[in-house]
Amino acid sequence: KNLILTIDNRIQRLAEKALGERIGAAVVLKPASGEVIAMVSYPYFDANVFSTDDSSVQYAMLASDKNKPMLNRVVNAEYPPASTFKTIMSTAILSEKLFPSDKKIECPGRITYGDRVFRCHVGVPGHGWLDLKNALAQSCDVYFWVLGTDYLGVDRISSYAQEFGFGQSLEIDLPAQTKGTVPTAQWKWRKYREKWLGGDTMNISIGQGYTLVTPLHVANMMAMVCNSGKIYRPHLLKEVRDPSKNNE
């Protein structure tokens, strides 16, 4: 059987060029169908080496490589979602209606919580007064810290993250995929025997801390936004053709 993939050769090459030789991953989805039209993980390897006489030696070399070329980072490497998570936070703020989206919060560039000082990425004097629209556009940390700790809380934040597919398999047609982590107070207690702290909520509000996702999770989240919440299962297989038949 011949397997026809959803990969678009032109976009695949563009993604490879954009990533270059930096260790990481790039993935492009077609929001209207879930088709994966580009998937890059670097470093990578030539699978043809396994058809040679010294395939066992080649495998051992790849397996021991500290840069892990056999790891498909698109679906099996975990990273903090960082500021992409503010998309989920914005959805939660609009849906829960606990804080008017046009009401402004001042960003002085930093905020004190307990005995810790959390600094916005722009530093002092900060972004000034921002509503939700501008806070998202400028990726203001202070705005989302305040909304996360004072209005949403860890349970709501985690629930919305799960609604966007975080913390679960996206069931792509590959042998395995890492689910990632969407932390809750219960999760932290089970894993570390530690209580959930306000600082933990600060961290997850901007996609940091214990939250971990794959690049595919983030691409899928943005596809859901494009589709107004509708989700399609990400997939690589377009069709299966029988080489003995005339497939046009």
Where are these regions (language model features)?
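Conserved, well-ordered alpha-helix/loop/beta-strand core segments that scaffold catalytic motifs
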Residues: K1-A25, A32
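Beta-lactam-recognizing serine transpeptidase/beta-lactamase-like catalytic domain environment
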Residues: I7, P31-S83, I88-E248
